[in-house]
């Protein structure tokens, strides 16, 4: 089992070994942001999206190609065919190309005949309908760019989720630590009281039965402390789930560690809740809403591509031909021209694909409306909870004041020998 103690925990964070065993909330969140595996996985997804963008841009890379075929049999040279050149794809499906051909042989296909010195060509191919305004490589590049933004939004969403769970674990650790400290104080006070009762019994000022009552209180306090210790141990182990090193090695939190003492004073600065404005909150700025919008944008690119595929394929190509030593004379009467036309008669595949893409868009839009409504309701619920907690805090503060007054009064009565024992 790979576990590390407190000294290593601070060494990873470049903190001095002489530092106290208090772990501040800000330091803890910094560790989670940097080293938690789920946050690192989200970072890898951004890197993968960037790699996909690089691949999509590769579809527009110029290409060099060459093809050579030669056949000889029975002392006869049937044919020798060579074709080499380059292609430059552009944004709107237009391709520029150029190259050199040199073919010869006794059984050469007549359409492949070239001059003795070979044949240069330079040309262009243009898709007039399908593939002009949008084609597969254009769609892939657009989606890859959108996917970068989608990955960033999902990374932010994942990081927020991890930090939220980590903060809850820290607060739970803080609560259980304070509870354990409180019951430890209760136990010490009960033991002091038991010792005092026994002394009074020995002096004849108290009945022996009073020690039984005091001992029951001690045992109850000891039981409360043991239960609080169990809760604290569980909270500490839960907190350890969020502590990792840079090499993805888990860190076990030591028992000597304790949460930040002044957390209540600093928590608003750590979480920037002073600048939180829930009244004019816009759901469009939420990373989950942004992620869904990016998904819809990607499906919209697919929809445009599928709609374009309903058009006929009409590709026009033109090549300027010339001998190598006459290429700059621009004899435009020497050329090769072609037209390619194709269209499915029923377009069932294309229509079905377009319909499916439209349904995916509608599904995402329904999900978007649901998420917006759910998010707004959650915000309203949080606002109501915050207001209620503020009222409860005020009431508890008043209770503390009243109990403090009662304590002072009981201390006076105790000094006079009239206080009740409870």
Name each model feature, range by range.
Residues 64-78, 93-115, 119, 123-157, ...:
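Small/polar (Gly/Ser/Thr/Ala-rich) solvent-exposed segments
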Residues 1-22:
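Bacterial Sec-dependent N-terminal signal peptides
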Residues 17-79, 129, 133-137, 143-145, ...:
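Bacterial Sec-pathway N-terminal export signals of envelope proteins
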């Amino acid at each position: 089992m790979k576990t590390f103690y407190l000294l290593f925990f601070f060494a990873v964070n470049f903190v001095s070994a002489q530092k106290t065993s208090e772990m501040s909330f800000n330091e803890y969140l910094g560790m989670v942001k940097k080293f938690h595996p789920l946050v690192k996985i989200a970072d890898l997804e951004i890197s993968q999206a960037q790699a996909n963008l690089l691949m999509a841009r590769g579809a527009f890379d110029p290409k060099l190609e060459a093809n050579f075929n030669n056949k000889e049999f029975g002392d006869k040279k049937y044919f020798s065919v060579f074709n080499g050149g380059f292609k430059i794809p552009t944004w709107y499906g237009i391709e520029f190309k150029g190259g050199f051909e040199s073919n010869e042989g006794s059984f050469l296909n007549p359409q492949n005949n070239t001059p003795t010195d070979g044949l240069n060509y330079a040309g262009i191919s243009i898709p007039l309908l399908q593939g002009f305004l949008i084609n597969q490589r254009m769609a892939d590049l657009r989606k890859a760019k959108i996917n970068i933004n989608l990955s960033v939004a999902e990374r932010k969403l994942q990081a927020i989720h991890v930090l939220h769970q980590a903060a809850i674990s820290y607060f739970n650790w803080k609560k259980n630590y304070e509870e354990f400290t409180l019951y430890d104080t209760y136990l010490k006070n009960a033991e002091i009281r038991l010792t005092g009762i026994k002394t009074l019994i020995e002096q004849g000022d108290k009945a022996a039965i009073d020690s039984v009552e005091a001992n029951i209180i001690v045992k109850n306090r000891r039981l409360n402390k043991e239960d609080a210790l169990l809760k604290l141990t569980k909270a500490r182990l839960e907190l350890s789930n969020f502590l990792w090193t840079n090499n993805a090695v888990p860190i076990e939190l030591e028992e000597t560690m304790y949460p930040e003492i002044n957390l209540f004073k600093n928590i608003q600065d750590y979480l920037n809740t002073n600048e939180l404005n829930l009244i004019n909150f816009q759901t469009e700025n939420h990373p989950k809403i942004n992620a869904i919008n990016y998904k819809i944008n990607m499906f919209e690119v697919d929809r445009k591509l599928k709609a374009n595929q309903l058009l006929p394929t009409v590709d026009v190509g033109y090549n300027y031909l010339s001998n190598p030593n006459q290429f700059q004379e621009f004899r435009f009467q020497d050329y090769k021209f072609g037209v390619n036309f194709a269209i499915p008669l029923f377009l069932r595949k294309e229509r079905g694909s377009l319909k499916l893409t439209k349904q995916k868009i509608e599904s995402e839009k329904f999900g978007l409306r649901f998420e917006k409504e759910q998010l707004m309701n959650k915000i309203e619920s949080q606002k109501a909870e915050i207001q209620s907690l503020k009222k409860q805090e005020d009431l508890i503060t008043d209770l503390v004041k009243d109990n403090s007054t009662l304590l002072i009064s009981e201390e006076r009565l105790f000094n006079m020998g009239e206080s009740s024992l409870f």
